């Protein structure tokens, strides 16, 4: 894969990142996507540009976004006993035709590096068993399962990583 451009999104170039995130959300969760825009995407600058616990990274091929990853301040909505300055890794998605080329791993490495450079030491994420190979991928990135939750809506796997 030649000439991929990885970059941290700033306040002047986030519109296409939001559009891509909404598109991927609809692909992954069509039954809950009904046109509502999540709070973090409505307030992108607040969550990902101005907040020191926020970061949003895109990767482009021929000026088209083909993948993203982000972190934001964890809101402690699950009772998981995580450190106060934990960030939540969100929005990892690579278009299917670009997968199996190491792009997701490179996005993770860039995100982890950014977090370390900003004195972040605790990462949290959750994934779902219906996402193929997600738990295995995150384990390969150094995350450990801290809790499994079986619910009526989405079974959830909670994972964390220390930097």
Positions of the model-derived regions?
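Extreme N-terminal starter segment of soluble prokaryotic enzymes
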Residues: 2-6
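Acetyl-CoA-dependent GNAT
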Residues: 8-90, 95, 108-110, 114, ...
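C-terminal "cap" of GNAT-fold acetyltransferases
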Residues: 23-24, 85-87, 121-163
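Ser/Thr-centric signal marking residues that sit
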Residues: 68, 105, 127
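Active-site acidic-Proline motif in GNAT/NAT acetyltransferases
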Residues: 95-97, 101, 129
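Residues forming the Rossmann-fold NAD(P)(H) cofactor-binding site
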Residues: 101, 105, 109
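Conserved GNAT acetyl-CoA-binding A-motif
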Residues: 108, 115-126
């Amino acid at each position: 894969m030649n000439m991929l451009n990885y970059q941290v999104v700033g306040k002047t170039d986030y519109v296409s990142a939001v559009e891509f995130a909404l598109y991927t959300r609809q692909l992954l969760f069509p039954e809950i996507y009904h046109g509502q825009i999540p709070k973090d995407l409505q307030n992108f600058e607040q969550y990902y540009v101005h907040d020191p616990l926020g970061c949003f990274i895109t990767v482009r091929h021929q000026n088209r976004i083909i993948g993203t990853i982000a972190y934001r301040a964890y809101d402690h909505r699950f009772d998981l006993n995580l450190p106060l300055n934990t960030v939540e890794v969100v929005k990892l998605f690579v278009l299917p035709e670009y997968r199996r080329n190491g792009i997701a791993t490179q996005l993770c490495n860039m995100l982890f590096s950014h977090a370390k450079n900003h004195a972040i030491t605790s990462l949290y994420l959750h994934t779902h068993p219906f996402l193929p190979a997600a738990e295995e991928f995150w384990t390969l990135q150094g995350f450990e399962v801290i809790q499994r939750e079986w619910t009526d809506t989405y079974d959830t796997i909670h994972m964390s990583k220390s930097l």
